[in-house]
Amino acid sequence: MPFKDQLFLASQYLAPHHLVSRLMGRVADCRAPEIKNRMIARFVRRYNVDMSEALVEDPLAYASFNDFFTRALKPDARPLDDEPGAALCPADGAISQIGAIDNGRIFQAKGHSFGLTDLLGGDAERAAPFAGGQFATIYLSPRDYHRVHMPLAGTLREMVHVPGRLFSVNPLTARSVPELFARNERVACLFDTEHGPMALVLVGAMIVASIETVWAGLVTPHKRQVRSVRYDAAARAPIHLDKGAEMGRFKLGSTVIVLFGPKRLRWLDLPSVRGPVRMGETLALPASTAISFPESE
């Protein structure tokens, strides 16, 4: 491994993850024009951000860097595929891994996997509906659209905030940090859908200031304990989201992991798999009509 990679990995273990992220979050929320305009302009140049898709095309018109980063797109920028029964890609990004949940483990990178139960906060009963099911890991790069949408119409059953570290998420850390996605702070949202159980897990990372959902707003840490909120209780009004509807967003984003139960859906075998994807593209079809995807390597 090159020395610079070793140095970067060492810094990941030594850095005060949450302190750095809180400081970056405050800077990203700054509304002083001389600060936020410089940050936004440099970001657009560095990452070649396509503002023609944004509802507000002028990057300097946003009140803060975070407002720019979580910008809305024009209504026709991400048309939804209309294949009956299809599950859509929930976000812009790149599929880093996709396949079957094998013996309660999810593939991370060569030589590394992580536990399904650990990912969902350590509750075996919560994880059981996804045993033997399917997963897809979608990485959102800095230039991507950072809102997350529903692959299927669903009724929210539970939201789980799992505290943890905030390692950077990239190919190097995926190859080198054991159980990366089950160690980083994350928010798991569990839904009931026409194809059975579905989970969307929004994984934080270094300098990810916050994760929001459309029903709860900003999801903030609660000490060091897993916090679960049930939405299927009689005391709460049901929350139902349509297919393609926004369900959450990253302020300085990271990764979305999609989980489905067994024998319901199969991933579509397309050139885009393990490569760039866009929100609204078909990601999976009912098991009776799709081609199974080969095992992760």
From Swiss-Prot:
Description of how the protein assembles with itself and partners: Heterodimer of a large membrane-associated beta subunit and a small pyruvoyl-containing alpha subunit.
Organism of origin: Bordetella pertussis (strain Tohama I / ATCC BAA-589 / NCTC 13251)
Keyword list, A-Z: Cell membrane, Decarboxylase, Lipid biosynthesis, Lipid metabolism, Lyase, Membrane, Phospholipid biosynthesis, Phospholipid metabolism, Pyruvate, Zymogen
InterPro entries membership: PS_Dcarbxylase (IPR003817), PSD-B (IPR033177), PSD_type1_pro (IPR033178)
Membrane topology: Peripheral membrane protein
Role noted for this protein: Catalyzes the formation of phosphatidylethanolamine (PtdEtn) from phosphatidylserine (PtdSer).
Gene encoding the protein: psd
Record-given protein name: Phosphatidylserine decarboxylase proenzyme
NCBIfam families on file: PS_decarb (TIGR00163)
GO CC terms in record: plasma membrane
Organism taxonomic ancestry: Bacteria, Pseudomonadati, Pseudomonadota, Betaproteobacteria, Burkholderiales
Signal sequence interval, chain numbering: none
Enzyme Commission number(s) of this protein: 4.1.1.65
Chain positions found as Pyruvic acid (Ser): S254
Localization per record: Cell membrane
GO biological process terms on file: phosphatidylethanolamine biosynthetic process
